[in-house]
Every structure is written in structure tokens, then in C-alpha cells.
């Protein structure tokens, strides 16, 4: 019997999305970003499905070590860099690249005793003002890294966009100009583009693109949908009806009697809730896909269940599947109803949700 709830992950969708991004940025190599457990899709599952990617981007060393232990041989890059001096021998032993963005990391590299140099991607703060060396610091920092025997040469260069998911916002052009002026004529790879950069800002594509959310079939732009770019949702979040009940006009449902029926109807109870990562704040009207149609959530989402209005003439049965998001119901649409972003929905699923390749 199939587990419920479950996240069905489509290997063919992941491979399609990688192909779409390669076509979009045909001159660039692809560093598939698989941090946060492959955006909730399963770290090793995703990496194996995307084995033709040129490299993988991760947030934490533990993620990179898991991929190496799972047999992944491709280039790995720690997008936040290393945090402790004791991380450096592990980077060397497992051939893992690191971002450098802070003085403390440079000091650790200068003081370390390593068997071979570490491959470094120097992050430039071109305007996001979160991580990276400022334009004023760049020349001095670059010179220090060049002088450091523990840093492999050439040094690679990167930045990150603040507003690339706003196609009408020209701040991305400002960031590109800042980065390109600073790094002109320097050797090494350059990477600027995230998913939004790859899809909307072709001049940002550089030697490598770093797509994340688009690999999973989701558009990075609010109000857009991955299907508009030929992307296919890689996750179907599925549960089932565990009760179907006749419900009278004037009767409330759920904690706090938050919703009251205006007319006689039939309600379905779906076995998923905030204990599984489905947001408690999903408002009335948030869609769920049941037997080929959208039905609205009514009442409050509870820990293990949510309730939907199936309609007065519904013929749905206990055991019928309910799709919370996926191919028939884009996660972007669900996120818009809830007032969040698709990134948050797919990455917040809890271990109670079985993740399985479909």
C-alpha cells in the first residue's frame, strides 16, 4: 500500500527541467542547486536524477559529504562556504569547492596546513548586501587569496542577485555592471545567474548558471508558472480522503468554528496537516485537487488533517487521492493563495511525508 501523505518525485520532470535550462543557457555549465534536501525533493534522489549536471551547489558541508558518500563524483560547491578551520581538511579529502565571502575564512585559509590547495570561488557583494566582499575590499582580498598557498589557482568569481525574480527591476543590471567591472580580465570561472537570472537575464549567464527552484519545475517569479517556460513540476504532494461527511447549512467545522457552511454540502477530510509541513495559515479557498477538480479548504488546517468542501453533489469516496500541489495544481498557485512562495512550501515538508521516486 502506498504511504500517505507522500511526495512523489518525477525523475523525468527533473531531467526535462535540466534540459530546458541547458537550452536557455547553452554556453554555460550548470551547477544544480540541491541544498535544503534537494529543495525538499530528496538530496541524493535529485543528484542521481540530475547526474548529467556539471556540478552541484549546496549550503552545508554535511550535504556535500552525503553526496560524496552516495557516489556523486561531480564538482560540489559550498555556497555559504566553510564555517570552521576543521572543515578545510574535509574539503581537501573530498574534493569540495568553497565560496569565500568573509575575512574570517581568509584567515583560516592562511593559517591552515593542508595537503593540497582548496578551490575557491570568491563571492562579490555586488548589491545584495548579505554575503560577499564589497567592491572596495575586492582588490585587497583577491590579492591575499592569490598569495595564499592553500588556495588553488585560478580563483573563481561569483555574485548573487537580489531582484532577478523581478524582471522589470533594473537593479539586476546594476549588479551585473558592478561585478563585471570589478572582475574584468581576471582568470577563472564566473557565475552570476540563479534560476531567475538564467530564465530572465541572459546576459548574466556566464560560465556557470546556478539554478535551484527552476530545476524542480517552479518559476522563481511571483505570478508566473514553470509551465510557461517548459518546466514540469517534479513533486506531486499526495494524500487521501479519510472521511466524507454530509454537512448542514449553518454548521461550523474545525478548531475555533472558523468556517460555517452557507448551504448543505459534503465535506472531505484529507490526511495532511501542519505536522506534515502543510501551512496552518492556509486560508479558506486554498485549492486542493480531488478527482479532476479544485475544491477549497474550509476551516483551519490542523496538525494531521485539513477539510475541503467537496460540494453538495459530490460522489467522492473515502480513500480517493487528494493532490495538495503538483502537475495538476501548480505549487505556485497554492503559494499565492497562502501568501508565501513555492520555495517555502516544498522545503518545509516534515519527515512524516514519505519522499519517493515516481
Swiss-Prot record:
EC number: 5.1.1.1
Reaction equations catalysed: L-alanine = D-alanine
Cofactor(s) the protein needs: pyridoxal 5'-phosphate
A single MF term (Gene Ontology): pyridoxal phosphate binding
Residues reported in the UniProt entry to bind substrate: 130, 303
Keyword tags: Isomerase, Pyridoxal phosphate
A cellular component term, taken from the record's GO annotations: cytosol
Superkingdom of origin: Bacteria
Family annotation (Pfam families): Ala_racemase_C, Ala_racemase_N
Transferase found in the keyword field: no
Active site: residue positions: 35, 255
Coiled-coil stretches: none
Keyword hit for Isomerase: yes
InterPro entries (alphabetical): Ala_racemase, Ala_racemase/Decarboxylase_C, Ala_racemase_C, Ala_racemase_N, Ala_racemase_pyridoxalP-BS, PLP-binding_barrel
Gene3D superfamilies listed in its UniProt record: Alanine racemase (3.20.20.10), Lyase, Ornithine Decarboxylase, Chain A, domain 1 (2.40.37.10)
Family as reported in the entry's similarity comment: Belongs to the alanine racemase family.
Protein name: Alanine racemase
Phylogenetic placement of the source organism: Bacteria, Pseudomonadati, Pseudomonadota, Gammaproteobacteria, Alteromonadales
Amino acid at each position: 500500500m502506498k504511504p500517505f501523505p507522500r511526495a512523489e518525485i518525477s525523475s523525468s520532470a527533473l531531467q526535462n527541467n535540466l534540459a530546458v535550462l541547458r537550452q536557455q543557457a547553452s554556453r554555460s555549465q550548470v551547477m544544480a542547486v540541491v541544498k535544503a534536501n534537494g529543495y525538499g525533493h530528496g538530496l541524493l534522489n535529485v543528484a542521481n536524477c540530475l547526474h548529467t549536471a556539471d556540478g552541484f551547489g549546496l549550503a552545508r558541508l554535511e550535504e556535500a559529504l552525503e553526496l560524496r558518500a552516495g557516489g556523486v563524483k561531480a564538482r560540489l560547491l559550498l555556497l555559504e562556504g566553510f564555517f570552521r578551520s576543521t572543515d578545510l581538511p574535509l574539503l581537501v579529502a573530498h574534493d569540495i569547492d568553497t565560496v569565500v565571502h568573509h575575512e574570517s575564512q581568509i584567515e583560516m585559509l592562511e593559517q591552515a596546513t593542508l595537503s593540497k590547495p582548496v578551490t575557491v570561488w570568491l563571492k562579490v557583494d555586488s548589491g545584495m548586501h548579505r554575503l560577499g566582499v564589497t567592491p572596495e575590499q575586492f582588490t585587497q582580498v583577491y590579492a591575499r587569496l592569490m598569495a595564499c598557498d592553500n588556495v588553488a589557482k585560478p580563483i573563481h568569481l561569483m555574485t548573487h542577485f537580489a531582484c532577478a525574480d523581478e524582471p522589470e527591476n533594473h537593479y539586476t543590471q546594476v549588479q551585473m555592471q558592478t561585478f563585471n567591472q570589478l572582475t574584468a580580465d581576471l582568470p577563472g570561472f564566473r557565475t552570476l545567474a540563479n534560476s531567475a537570472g538564467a530564465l530572465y537575464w541572459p546576459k548574466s549567464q556566464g560560465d556557470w548558471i546556478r539554478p535551484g527552484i527552476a530545476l524542480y519545475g517552479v518559476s522563481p517569479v511571483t505570478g508566473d508558472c514553470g509551465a510557461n517556460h517548459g518546466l514540469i513540476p517534479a513533486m506531486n504532494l499526495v494524500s487521501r480522503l479519510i472521511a466524507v461527511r454530509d454537512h448542514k447549512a449553518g454548521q461550523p467545522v474545525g478548531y475555533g468554528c472558523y468556517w460555517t457552511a452557507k448551504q448543505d454540502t459534503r465535506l472531505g477530510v484529507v490526511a495532511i496537516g501542519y505536522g506534515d509541513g502543510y501551512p496552518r495559515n492556509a486560508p479558506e479557498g486554498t485549492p486542493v485537487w480531488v478527482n479532476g477538480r479544485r475544491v477549497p479548504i474550509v476551516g483551519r488546517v490542523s496538525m494531521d488533517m485539513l477539510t475541503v468542501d467537496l460540494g453538495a453533489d459530490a460522489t467522492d469516496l473515502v480513500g480517493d487521492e487528494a493532490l495538495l500541489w503538483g502537475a495538476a495544481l501548480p505549487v505556485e498557485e497554492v503559494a499565492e493563495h497562502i501568501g508565501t512562495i513555492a520555495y517555502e512550501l516544498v522545503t518545509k515538508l516534515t519527515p512524516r511525508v514519505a519522499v519517493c521516486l515516481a
